[in-house]
């Protein structure tokens, strides 16, 4: 799939399947639908939507961090839990339940992971540049 310009006046206006594409929201105001590939080196924001069934679908065995921006994690259907890695030795993980129709804003630079309560639809928005994964110990 090649990038589909959403704001190009010569391109027909049509729906974008959010579960088959990622939306790239560029800093210059352009929006593009493209292959659902996480762009760690791109500019701007990336909107990602997923059908997920197991914790493996959300790499639940890894911590994730986004140093360039906050991340909005929304549960569209089902239910998820966000876990935040302790910032100090000896502290417990912080757990936040996210019901269908709600979202959490993950602070910039805060290590986090997702666990599912069951099959769910999730939407995420962040600046992916510099994002990292780290296997849970």
Q: Model segments located where?
A:
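A short, N-terminal "cap"/entry segment at the start of jelly-roll beta-barrel domains
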Residues: 1-62
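Double-stranded beta-helix
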Residues: 3-21, 57, 113-137
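Short, charged/polar surface micro-motifs in flexible loops or helix N-caps
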Residues: 43-45, 52-58, 77-81, 88, ...
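Short, surface-exposed beta-edge/turn micro-motifs
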Residues: 45, 69-72, 120
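Tight coil/turn sites that cap or link beta-strands
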Residues: 55-57, 100-101, 107-109, 119
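His/acidic/aromatic-lined binding-pocket segments of jelly-roll/cupin-type domains
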Residues: 64-65, 70-75, 96, 104, ...
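Short, conserved beta-strand element in jelly-roll/cupin
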Residues: 66-82, 86, 125
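Short acidic-glycine-tyrosine-enriched beta hairpin
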Residues: 87-108
